[in-house]
Amino acid sequence: MPSPLSLCRYLPRELSPSVDSRSCSIPLVAPRKAGKLFLGTTPPRAPGLPRRLAWFSIDWEQVCLMHRLGSGGFGSVYKATYHGVPVAIKQVNKCTKDLRASQRSFWAELNIARLRHDNIVRVVAASTRTPEDSNSLGTIIMEFGGNVTLHQVIYGATRSPEPLSCREQLSLGKCLKYSLDVVNGLLFLHSQSILHLDLKPANILISEQDVCKISDFGCSQKLQDLRCRQSPHHIGGTYTHQAPEILKGEIATPKADIYSFGITLWQMTTREVPYSGEPQYVQYAVVAYNLRPSLTGAVFTASLTRKTLQNIIQNCWEARALQRPGAELLQRDLKAFRGALG
């Protein structure tokens, strides 16, 4: 998640992105003064641990949970402080119905653990250490930058005491600004051979500096891992934003994220929901009948310039992945369109 502070300036060097895979037993979360929650203390690191593993840990005494921000199928996210710096902490649940899916989600979140980009949520640290008796596979500490997602801005459902005006917040110029933020993030991810595979407005955070950052990497995959698989592999995600080839169980490519971006851009410009109806019927129609959201609104047809926006979206959600633009070409097209608008 985006952060108004540069964590690098405030956190010790050993707290750079990390994974602590050691087993442990730490106290249950216990209430303390001022209504805050502390995770308690943990046993000291075993003597003789190699120096190269010095950053494979979370300093639990410095973790202060404040309140829950939200929850989903694979876990809960809390606002917290870490060494006094605002962060978000995600705890991945042990899903009793599908433990492997929970495990995949936890480790997938760490695909970006060592990456740095302005439009990507930064992982500060991670650990498989969990409080005793908790239903958690592990903990991930991420940078924090507020409570607002692109979904909330589009549909006007924020936690702010003064609701955002969608029309003020999402003018066409603002849509293009946010779109370029997201595409810049995708371009970086794809250059690192990482696919997000669940890109949608709810997984795009907007910082206090009005910068979009891609978050929630629980469905992400590394390209080399996908290429090594000899049989189709189920990929999680949101059916309304999944490319036809993903719905058919084919191997994912970076073009799957481009398809998801096309749906997201359509949502930004129309402020409508992509589909209605039962999921299985929508999925079938997307694959068999090339079903897509409507592009007949005035926002796409009012002028030749607006037709360009329609073409950009159509190119993103082409049925055949090879016909979709890559992130670099998409970035160029969006910049050209923004320039044409003046």
From Swiss-Prot:
Annotated Gene3D superfamilies:
Phosphorylase Kinase, domain 1, Transferase(Phosphotransferase) domain 1
Q: Where does ATP bind?
A: 69-77, 90
Question: Which Pfam families is this protein grouped with?
Answer: Pkinase (PF00069)
What GO molecular function terms would the record report?
ATP binding; protein serine kinase activity; protein serine/threonine kinase activity
The active site is formed by: 198
Q: Which UniProt keywords apply?
A: ATP-binding, Kinase, Nucleotide-binding, Oncogene, Serine/threonine-protein kinase, Transferase
Q: What is its EC number?
A: 2.7.11.1
Q: Where is the Protein kinase domain?
A: 63-338
Reaction catalysis annotation: L-seryl-[protein] + ATP = O-phospho-L-seryl-[protein] + ADP + H(+); L-threonyl-[protein] + ATP = O-phospho-L-threonyl-[protein] + ADP + H(+)
PANTHER family, sorted: SERINE/THREONINE-PROTEIN KINASE TNNI3K-RELATED, V-MOS MOLONEY MURINE SARCOMA VIRAL ONCO HOMOLOG
What family does this chain come from, according to its entry?
A: Belongs to the protein kinase superfamily. Ser/Thr protein kinase family.
Protein name as catalogued: Serine/threonine-protein kinase-transforming protein mos
